[in-house]
Amino acid sequence: LRHDDIHLANATGEGNLVVLFGARTGGDGIGGASILASETFEDGMPAKRPSVQVGDPFMEKVLIECCLDLFEADVVQGIQDLGAAGISCATSELASNGDSGMHVDLENVLLRDPTLTAGEILMSESQERMMAIVTPQDRERFFEIIDKWDVEAAVIGHLTGDGRLTIDHYGHRIVDVDPKTVAHEGPVYDRPYARPAWQDELQAATSESLARPATREELIADVRAVLSDVNQASKAWVTDQYDRYVQ
């Protein structure tokens, strides 16, 4: 991809369409520690289980080739992948970068799991999804290329001139914010900090001032202490237990 063919994550042009394409939206990446901290696991309650997002290499390859075709046809005004925080992140960053407003109708999102709530749809981290800004004039050509690669897509919103990010779910307004406050002007922590006293002592130490093992047993003990330190020891007992196929 030539540098002059790079498309940025900017949403500009009032009336332009917001298109979500690629894989369908599921429950991937929702919950995590907040679910484990919940005390509500009663029968009859909605299932509370985190779902680890698992990539699909074939779908990823198809989506890459599809995007390259879209770029070559010059039917994309702006584009962004969906990663952490999913739709909530992509919409706010696109609108903020382009100094634009955006309206989204969340019910138009293609779902893999129809039981997802509005909040879950917004925060889903399902892989292999892209969000593009397309002019109404390029809509037909855009979807021709999408269909050629057998990729699913849906128009979920449009750009506005009011500078607000608004998101509705079946007529109910669930988001109405300035996108910059979400994407780039969020709260910044001003945490107290100080230089640790032990750093001065450590940096002042020399090879002559450090204790050295005098016997074989002391040397073995020192080596074992280093190897058993949590920063040095094998992490396999944790990583080998992690099930990345949790559904």
Language-model segments: residues:
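Glycine/proline-enriched, intrinsically flexible loops and inter-domain linkers
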Residues: 1-247
